[in-house]
Amino acid sequence: MSRIIGFDAIVHGNDKILILGSMPSIKSLEENMYYANPSNRFWPMLSNIYNMPVTTREEKLKLLKENQIALWDICHSCIRKGGMDSAIKETIPNDIELLLEENPSIQKIICNGKTSYTLLKKYFQREGICCSSTSSANARKTLEDVIIEYKGVLL
């Protein structure tokens, strides 16, 4: 297994919220875009909450910018067999502290799933809000459940 390297942060200089995932999925890495797996509910959830389309990459980036949302992953790199968070090993974290220092307008950190939250606590001892994973692997939650949960912390 080779080491997987994630994406750069998406930041706009005036963001109020940072959403942290764990590590991009295989499909996301192939498409070079966060949450590119069509079964992941991340973009449909944000589209519903902010009433904005997310059909194209440009629309997704516009939604983040207009709603002052930064996006990144806890892991800069890791070893992972398959796409599940449970398979993440040998993590090297991104420099979340530096990102927050360079973007002091960020007031809230939201973790997309337990793995992200656990790694945030492990590496940074930062306060974050742990929300349910938007991954389709989280079958216990419907899209509507996820929308309600995230709406409560985003708005």
Where are these predicted regions, by residue range?
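A polyanion-binding, active-site-adjacent surface
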Residues: 1-108, 112-118, 123, 129-132, ...
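Post-His helix in hydrolase/transferase enzymes
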Residues: 140-147
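A polyampholytic, Gly/Pro-enriched intrinsically disordered region
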Residues: 147-155
